[in-house]
């Protein structure tokens, strides 16, 4: 099975999630991405090489940003997870830093 690693911003957000339903939706999204990494929307420009996956819950749009790396096997790296508000600005800042 494809390995999944979490960068600090994603790990922190997912660890702080208290809502069990939302946490389950994120886990289901990660499982879907693990099966087919092209399921997310490929980003371009400053975010080329990343994919974005939308999660809708309780009238709020949540995002999951990830990239795929090949070492010995395919590894999916979850870069960031959060609400849609300012998500891509934060993601760009993190990727540049």
Regions found by a protein language model. Give the residues of each.
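Conserved catalytic core of Hanks-type protein kinase domains
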Residues: 16, 32-33, 81
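Arg/Lys-rich, positively charged N-terminal/basic patches that mediate binding to nucleic acids
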Residues: 1-29
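Enriched for short, Lys/Arg-rich terminal
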Residues: 57-63, 67-97
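A short, surface-exposed loop/turn module that caps and links secondary-structure elements
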Residues: 31-58
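Short amphipathic C-terminal alpha-helix that caps PH/PH-like domains
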Residues: 30-31, 95
């Amino acid at each position: 099975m494809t390995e999944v690693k979490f960068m600090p911003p994603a790990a922190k957000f997912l660890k702080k999630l208290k809502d069990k339903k939302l946490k389950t939706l994120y886990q289901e999204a990660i499982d879907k991405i693990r099966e087919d990494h092209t399921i997310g929307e490929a980003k371009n420009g400053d975010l080329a090489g990343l994919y974005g996956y939308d999660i809708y819950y309780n009238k709020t749009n949540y995002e999951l940003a990830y990239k795929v790396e090949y070492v010995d096997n395919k590894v999916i790296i979850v870069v960031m997870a959060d609400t849609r508000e300012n998500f891509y600005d934060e993601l760009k800042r993190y990727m540049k830093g």
